[in-house]
Amino acid sequence: MTKKEALSIVFSCAPLYKENLVDKSLLFITTDKHKSVHCLEVTFDISNFLHMTGFKLCKPGINARHFFNLCYDKRLTEADFEFSADGTTEMKMRVLPSLMKKNLSAKMLGDYNMSQPKLYTDKIAGSLSACMGFVRDGGEGRFVPNTVLEGDIRTKVKAADRIIATYRKSRGEEQYSEIVFTAKKVEWEKIVLPDEYCYLVSVSYTHLRAH
Protein backbone atom coordinates (compact mmCIF):
# COMPACT_ATOMS: atom_id res chain seq x y z
CA MET A 1 0.00 0.00 0.00
CA THR A 2 1.28 3.46 -0.88
CA LYS A 3 0.95 6.61 1.21
CA LYS A 4 -1.26 8.05 -1.52
CA GLU A 5 -3.64 5.10 -1.19
CA ALA A 6 -3.67 5.45 2.60
CA LEU A 7 -4.45 9.15 2.35
CA SER A 8 -7.36 8.39 0.04
CA ILE A 9 -8.77 5.99 2.65
CA VAL A 10 -8.48 8.37 5.63
CA PHE A 11 -9.85 11.25 3.56
CA SER A 12 -12.97 9.19 2.79
CA CYS A 13 -13.29 7.80 6.34
CA ALA A 14 -12.94 11.07 8.28
CA PRO A 15 -16.29 12.56 7.12
CA LEU A 16 -18.04 9.23 7.83
CA TYR A 17 -16.50 9.09 11.30
CA LYS A 18 -17.66 12.65 12.03
CA GLU A 19 -21.18 12.06 10.71
CA ASN A 20 -21.79 8.67 12.30
CA LEU A 21 -19.73 8.53 15.50
CA VAL A 22 -18.01 11.75 16.66
CA ASP A 23 -19.50 13.12 19.91
CA LYS A 24 -21.82 10.14 20.04
CA SER A 25 -22.16 7.11 22.27
CA LEU A 26 -23.15 3.59 21.28
CA LEU A 27 -24.80 1.16 23.65
CA PHE A 28 -24.35 -2.52 22.84
CA ILE A 29 -26.89 -4.96 24.32
CA THR A 30 -25.49 -8.48 24.30
CA THR A 31 -26.46 -11.98 25.35
CA ASP A 32 -23.97 -14.67 26.35
CA LYS A 33 -24.24 -18.44 25.93
CA HIS A 34 -26.30 -18.61 29.15
CA LYS A 35 -28.75 -16.02 27.72
CA SER A 36 -27.65 -13.46 30.33
CA VAL A 37 -27.98 -9.85 29.15
CA HIS A 38 -25.07 -7.40 29.35
CA CYS A 39 -24.60 -3.78 28.27
CA LEU A 40 -21.55 -1.81 27.17
CA GLU A 41 -21.45 1.90 26.41
CA VAL A 42 -18.68 3.34 24.23
CA THR A 43 -18.04 6.99 23.37
CA PHE A 44 -16.34 8.56 20.35
CA ASP A 45 -14.32 11.76 19.95
CA ILE A 46 -12.37 13.21 17.03
CA SER A 47 -9.12 12.58 18.94
CA ASN A 48 -9.70 8.79 18.71
CA PHE A 49 -9.36 8.74 14.91
CA LEU A 50 -5.54 8.78 14.91
CA HIS A 51 -5.41 5.49 16.89
CA MET A 52 -7.65 3.87 14.31
CA THR A 53 -5.34 4.71 11.39
CA GLY A 54 -2.01 3.45 12.75
CA PHE A 55 -0.30 6.50 11.23
CA LYS A 56 2.96 7.58 12.90
CA LEU A 57 3.07 11.38 12.82
CA CYS A 58 6.36 12.98 11.83
CA LYS A 59 5.72 16.53 13.01
CA PRO A 60 5.48 17.32 16.75
CA GLY A 61 3.03 20.15 16.04
CA ILE A 62 0.27 17.76 14.91
CA ASN A 63 -1.83 16.39 17.78
CA ALA A 64 -4.67 13.90 17.47
CA ARG A 65 -7.39 16.54 17.05
CA HIS A 66 -5.36 18.47 14.48
CA PHE A 67 -4.71 15.20 12.64
CA PHE A 68 -8.43 14.50 12.30
CA ASN A 69 -9.12 18.00 11.02
CA LEU A 70 -6.32 17.66 8.45
CA CYS A 71 -7.89 14.38 7.25
CA TYR A 72 -11.38 15.87 7.22
CA ASP A 73 -10.20 18.86 5.18
CA LYS A 74 -8.03 16.62 2.95
CA ARG A 75 -4.93 18.62 3.89
CA LEU A 76 -2.78 15.87 5.42
CA THR A 77 0.30 15.25 3.24
CA GLU A 78 2.56 12.26 2.67
CA ALA A 79 5.33 14.12 4.52
CA ASP A 80 3.22 14.33 7.69
CA PHE A 81 3.24 10.61 8.54
CA GLU A 82 4.95 7.24 8.24
CA PHE A 83 3.53 3.72 8.28
CA SER A 84 4.11 1.63 11.37
CA ALA A 85 7.08 -0.69 10.83
CA ASP A 86 5.11 -3.76 11.94
CA GLY A 87 2.54 -3.55 9.14
CA THR A 88 -0.38 -2.54 11.34
CA THR A 89 -1.05 0.67 9.39
CA GLU A 90 -1.81 -1.24 6.19
CA MET A 91 -3.96 -3.70 8.17
CA LYS A 92 -5.97 -0.86 9.70
CA MET A 93 -6.44 0.78 6.31
CA ARG A 94 -8.00 -2.43 4.97
CA VAL A 95 -10.70 -2.55 7.65
CA LEU A 96 -11.29 1.10 8.60
CA PRO A 97 -13.96 1.86 5.94
CA SER A 98 -16.19 -1.01 7.09
CA LEU A 99 -16.06 0.23 10.71
CA MET A 100 -17.16 3.81 10.01
CA LYS A 101 -20.84 2.83 10.19
CA LYS A 102 -23.43 3.92 12.77
CA ASN A 103 -23.20 0.48 14.38
CA LEU A 104 -19.54 -0.30 13.51
CA SER A 105 -20.93 -3.26 11.50
CA ALA A 106 -20.55 -5.09 14.82
CA LYS A 107 -22.37 -8.36 15.48
CA MET A 108 -20.37 -9.65 18.48
CA LEU A 109 -18.62 -8.28 21.57
CA GLY A 110 -16.17 -9.69 24.08
CA ASP A 111 -13.22 -9.25 26.43
CA TYR A 112 -9.85 -9.20 24.70
CA ASN A 113 -8.02 -12.52 25.14
CA MET A 114 -4.44 -11.14 25.01
CA SER A 115 -3.74 -13.18 21.87
CA GLN A 116 -1.53 -10.49 20.32
CA PRO A 117 1.43 -9.62 22.61
CA LYS A 118 1.87 -6.02 21.44
CA LEU A 119 -1.82 -5.14 21.45
CA TYR A 120 -3.33 -3.35 24.44
CA THR A 121 -7.12 -3.10 24.55
CA ASP A 122 -9.97 -4.23 26.85
CA LYS A 123 -13.17 -4.83 24.90
CA ILE A 124 -13.56 -5.75 21.25
CA ALA A 125 -16.67 -5.29 19.09
CA GLY A 126 -16.85 -6.55 15.55
CA SER A 127 -17.64 -9.20 12.99
CA LEU A 128 -15.95 -12.07 11.18
CA SER A 129 -13.71 -9.68 9.23
CA ALA A 130 -13.17 -6.42 11.17
CA CYS A 131 -13.18 -5.29 14.80
CA MET A 132 -12.70 -2.23 16.98
CA GLY A 133 -10.98 -2.27 20.37
CA PHE A 134 -11.92 -0.13 23.38
CA VAL A 135 -10.19 0.90 26.62
CA ARG A 136 -11.37 2.69 29.73
CA ASP A 137 -10.74 6.42 29.47
CA GLY A 138 -8.86 7.53 32.56
CA GLY A 139 -10.44 4.80 34.63
CA GLU A 140 -13.75 6.65 34.87
CA GLY A 141 -15.77 3.86 33.33
CA ARG A 142 -16.14 5.41 29.89
CA PHE A 143 -14.90 3.16 27.11
CA VAL A 144 -13.29 4.83 24.09
CA PRO A 145 -11.86 3.29 20.89
CA ASN A 146 -8.09 2.75 20.78
CA THR A 147 -7.53 0.43 17.81
CA VAL A 148 -9.05 -1.38 14.84
CA LEU A 149 -8.25 -4.97 13.93
CA GLU A 150 -8.51 -7.21 10.90
CA GLY A 151 -9.94 -10.71 11.17
CA ASP A 152 -12.50 -12.80 13.02
CA ILE A 153 -13.50 -11.37 16.41
CA ARG A 154 -13.95 -14.91 17.75
CA THR A 155 -10.17 -15.42 17.64
CA LYS A 156 -9.52 -12.23 19.63
CA VAL A 157 -11.93 -12.48 22.59
CA LYS A 158 -12.40 -14.86 25.51
CA ALA A 159 -16.05 -15.37 24.59
CA ALA A 160 -17.91 -13.72 21.72
CA ASP A 161 -21.28 -12.55 23.04
CA ARG A 162 -23.99 -11.86 20.48
CA ILE A 163 -25.00 -8.24 20.02
CA ILE A 164 -28.80 -8.25 19.92
CA ALA A 165 -29.20 -4.47 19.62
CA THR A 166 -27.10 -1.32 19.28
CA TYR A 167 -28.39 2.12 20.24
CA ARG A 168 -26.90 5.53 19.47
CA LYS A 169 -27.20 8.94 21.10
CA SER A 170 -25.48 12.32 20.84
CA ARG A 171 -23.30 13.63 23.64
CA GLY A 172 -25.91 15.98 25.09
CA GLU A 173 -28.75 13.45 25.21
CA GLU A 174 -29.76 11.82 28.48
CA GLN A 175 -31.25 8.65 27.03
CA TYR A 176 -30.91 6.47 23.97
CA SER A 177 -33.76 6.73 21.45
CA GLU A 178 -32.16 5.70 18.13
CA ILE A 179 -31.66 2.04 17.35
CA VAL A 180 -28.98 1.38 14.72
CA PHE A 181 -28.80 -2.43 14.77
CA THR A 182 -31.04 -5.32 15.77
CA ALA A 183 -30.19 -8.99 15.43
CA LYS A 184 -32.63 -11.41 13.86
CA LYS A 185 -34.69 -13.89 15.88
CA VAL A 186 -34.47 -12.17 19.26
CA GLU A 187 -37.19 -13.01 21.78
CA TRP A 188 -37.53 -9.48 23.11
CA GLU A 189 -40.23 -10.41 25.59
CA LYS A 190 -37.63 -12.56 27.39
CA ILE A 191 -34.93 -9.88 27.48
CA VAL A 192 -34.46 -8.33 30.93
CA LEU A 193 -32.39 -5.15 30.79
CA PRO A 194 -30.52 -3.53 33.71
CA ASP A 195 -32.62 -0.90 35.51
CA GLU A 196 -30.78 2.07 34.02
CA TYR A 197 -31.65 0.86 30.51
CA CYS A 198 -35.10 -0.66 31.07
CA TYR A 199 -36.68 2.23 29.14
CA LEU A 200 -35.10 0.76 25.99
CA VAL A 201 -37.66 -2.05 25.87
CA SER A 202 -40.25 0.38 24.50
CA VAL A 203 -37.70 1.79 22.03
CA SER A 204 -37.04 -1.73 20.74
CA TYR A 205 -40.71 -2.61 20.36
CA THR A 206 -41.42 0.66 18.55
CA HIS A 207 -38.56 -0.04 16.15
CA LEU A 208 -39.62 -3.63 15.53
CA ARG A 209 -43.21 -2.66 14.81
CA ALA A 210 -41.98 -0.06 12.32
CA HIS A 211 -39.97 -2.71 10.48
Summary of predicted features, one role per range:
Residues 1-115, 197-199, 204:
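Compact soluble domain cores
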Residues 95-187:
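Conserved binding-pocket/active-site segment within a compact domain
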